[in-house]
């Protein structure tokens, strides 16, 4: 039976601070991770995500604050005595040892009785479907197999939390996609809390129960992949996760609790937001490429849509991506449509005049002042 995340924190970071010299990386940082969750700590280079992982692993010392593991304060517990294991980007397998000995290494260091070691190692190898590789050396394995061995070596110690540090980045695209699925299935099977650190937003969306997106040592947003993609808290989040188009808007009037009449790039239309607004207030309307609708127009045809022309198009198999340049200000937007070869209006020509609208209610509305 698949493990489901439980509403009980297995990890708590309480007001932690870490500096390197005069450079403060994280300050007054708080985070709780529930038992059985697959959490991805995501962010650009220098945001503090690797520092958080190293603090959890016990590879760095806190300046202040505390780390709680399953109700126990482990702030001053050395790395080797924490029930936390790490899979590094390099996998760090011993090339002179067999796969069996690589996986058994941690158990031998803990002086686990020999009669326990073999069944535990074989069980771990069975979990990652590499039991038949036990007598081989790491150099005889593919990158994906080496990654699974690194995971087996980590889980054989039965940790409460498994940390993964950019551990898919060395794989080619096809294998990386496969390993994303396998990691998620393995995490459900093992029932261990996984904390995955990456800068790759596609990996985060694909695998995670929850994403913690960092910016300059602070949590920019903490939520499910769907929440972060469909309801970004600010412009940084929207731009970091997927493609986004940002339209300038001016409030005309509030029509109801949820609906505001606005001028969006010259188009007078309803936008959906419950935030307090005033007449003439500046807003930003965020639209994903797949939220936008293109209508082909004759050169003299009237339309209430935002008018522009196709300046680029890219066929991507299932989708057609078009770049539209607005006539009124030269702004460019990206539009993604599911490709329908039977639709004569689908494959837009360069230079085609078009009207731009969007699926009503799919927009995200932000206060312009919040996104500086």
Swiss-Prot record:
> For this protein, what reaction is catalysed?
ATP + H2O + polyamine-[polyamine-binding protein]Side 1 = ADP + phosphate + polyamineSide 2 + [polyamine-binding protein]Side 1
- One Pfam match: TOBE_2
A single Gene Ontology MF term assigned here is: ATP binding
Q: Which InterPro entries match?
A: AAA+_ATPase, ABC_SmlMolc_Importer, ABC_transporter-like_ATP-bd, ABC_transporter-like_CS, Mo/tungstate-bd_C_term_dom, P-loop_NTPase, PotA-like, PotA_ATP-bd
Question: How is it placed in the membrane, per its record?
Answer: Peripheral membrane protein
Which CDD domains does this entry report, sorted A to Z?
Answer: ABC_PotA_N (cd03300)
Record-listed E.C. numbers:
7.6.2.11
Its assembly, as annotated, is: The complex is composed of two ATP-binding proteins (PotA), two transmembrane proteins (PotB and PotC) and a solute-binding protein (PotD).
Briefly, what is this protein's role?
A: Part of the ABC transporter complex PotABCD involved in spermidine/putrescine import. Responsible for energy coupling to the transport system.
What protein family is recorded?
Belongs to the ABC transporter superfamily. Spermidine/putrescine importer (TC 3.A.1.11.1) family.
What name does UniProt use for this protein? Spermidine/putrescine import ATP-binding protein PotA
Please spell out the taxonomic lineage of the organism that makes this protein: Bacteria, Pseudomonadati, Pseudomonadota, Gammaproteobacteria, Pasteurellales
Gene behind the chain: potA
């Amino acid at each position: 039976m698949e493990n489901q995340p439980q509403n009980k924190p297995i990890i708590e970071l309480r007001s932690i601070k870490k500096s390197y010299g005069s450079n403060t990386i994280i300050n007054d940082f708080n985070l709780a991770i529930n038992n059985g969750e697959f959490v991805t700590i995501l962010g650009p280079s220098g945001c503090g995500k690797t520092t958080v992982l190293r603090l959890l692993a016990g590879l760095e010392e806190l300046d202040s604050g505390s780390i709680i593991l399953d109700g126990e304060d482990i702030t001053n517990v050395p790395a080797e005595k924490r029930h936390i294991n790490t899979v590094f980007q390099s996998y760090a397998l011993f090339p002179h040892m067999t796969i069996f000995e690589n996986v058994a290494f941690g158990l031998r260091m803990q002086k686990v009785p020999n009669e326990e070691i073999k069944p535990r190692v074989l069980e771990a190898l069975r979990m990652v479907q590499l039991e038949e590789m036990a007598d081989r050396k790491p150099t005889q394995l593919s990158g994906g197999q080496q990654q699974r061995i690194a995971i087996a070596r980590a889980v054989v110690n039965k940790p409460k939390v498994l940390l993964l540090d950019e551990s898919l980045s060395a794989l080619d695209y096809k294998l990386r996609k496969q390993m994303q699925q396998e990691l998620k299935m393995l995490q459900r099977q093992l029932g261990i809390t996984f904390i995955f650190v990456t800068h790759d937003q596609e990996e985060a969306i694909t695998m995670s129960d929850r994403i913690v997106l960092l910016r300059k040592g602070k949590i920019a947003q903490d939520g499910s992949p769907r929440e972060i993609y469909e309801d970004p808290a600010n412009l940084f989040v929207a731009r970091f996760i997927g493609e986004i188009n940002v339209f300038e808007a001016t409030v005309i009037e509030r029509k109801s609790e949820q609906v505001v009449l606005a001028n969006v790039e010259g188009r007078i239309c309803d936008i959906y937001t419950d935030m307090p607004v005033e007449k003439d207030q500046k807003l930003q309307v965020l639209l994903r490429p797949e939220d936008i609708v293109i209508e082909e127009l004759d050169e003299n045809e009237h339309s209430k849509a935002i008018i522009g022309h196709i300046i680029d198009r890219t066929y991507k198999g299932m989708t057609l991506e078009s770049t539209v340049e607005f006539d009124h200000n030269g702004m460019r937007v990206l539009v993604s449509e599911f490709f329908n070869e039977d639709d004569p209006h689908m494959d837009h020509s360069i230079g085609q005049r078009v009207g731009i609208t969007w699926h009503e209610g799919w927009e995200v509305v932000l206060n312009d002042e919040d996104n500086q």
